[in-house]
């Protein structure tokens, strides 16, 4: 009688390598599909995490009215809620070159303007045309003899200064924003500004931060008022030395 014995078989190393490779390809592909389909949700979640941990970073600009400073940080928390807001370009991209407005037109993936592109950049998401117009009026480098298409520095301090000067120009808004803020009419101010920054509410592009903005403003205002008080005390102490 012929007896058959089972032969112990060992896995083929080449076959195992091929299986691992195929599995990795499948996992990478699935990951890309998941990320693409959930990119906006992931972005919103990350914004909430950053906001809860860091709030809205202090301004680079020193001085100025604390009520307006708090408003500027509130605009930033809705428009550019990232770790380095001054360097942000629309879509969550970053630029290292702030010698001038980045002027990169990034495709808009969702919302009513889908299919168009946006040049919004910096902490306050200035469009290139808006930056040029407002820099001509409010940038420290501006002058009556400056040509209209002059390339103004987009460094962080100038982003702050241009916006501060714009917000405090009553003629630009036909309202006294500082007085409204001191009367705690922040909702009225946000509505006034919403045609310019639509994420502030009352517009067409609310985001996860929009409904929290009045509360965010009041929190930031308390920080700015405290900082101003500390600065005044320090100055007083220096004068008494």
Question: What do the PLM-derived regions correspond to, one by one?
Answer:
Residues 13-16, 76:
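Hydrophobic transmembrane-helix microenvironments that flank and shape a buried ionizable site
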């Amino acid at each position: 009688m012929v007896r058959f014995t089972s032969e112990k078989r060992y896995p083929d190393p080449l076959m195992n390598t091929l299986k691992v490779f195929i599995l990795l390809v499948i996992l990478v592909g699935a990951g890309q599909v998941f990320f693409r389909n959930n990119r906006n949700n992931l972005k919103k979640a990350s914004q909430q995490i950053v906001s809860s941990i860091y709030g809205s970073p202090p301004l680079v600009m020193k001085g100025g009215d604390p009520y307006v400073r708090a408003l500027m940080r509130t605009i930033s928390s809705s428009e550019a809620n990232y770790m380095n807001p001054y360097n942000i370009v629309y879509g969550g991209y970053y630029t290292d070159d702030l010698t001038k407005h980045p002027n990169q037109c990034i495709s808009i993936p969702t919302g009513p303007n889908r299919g168009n592109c946006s040049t919004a950049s910096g902490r306050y998401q200035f469009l290139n045309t808006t930056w040029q117009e407002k820099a001509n009026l409010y940038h420290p480098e501006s002058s009556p003899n400056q040509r209209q298409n002059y390339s103004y520095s987009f460094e962080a301090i100038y982003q702050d200064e241009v916006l501060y000067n714009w917000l405090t120009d009553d003629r630009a808004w036909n309202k006294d924003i500082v007085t409204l803020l001191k009367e705690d009419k922040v909702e009225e101010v946000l509505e006034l500004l919403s045609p310019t920054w639509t994420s502030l509410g009352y517009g067409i592009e609310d985001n996860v931060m929009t409904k929290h903005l009045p509360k965010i403003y009041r929190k930031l205002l308390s920080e700015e008022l405290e900082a101003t008080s500390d600065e005044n005390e320090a100055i007083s102490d220096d004068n008494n030395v």
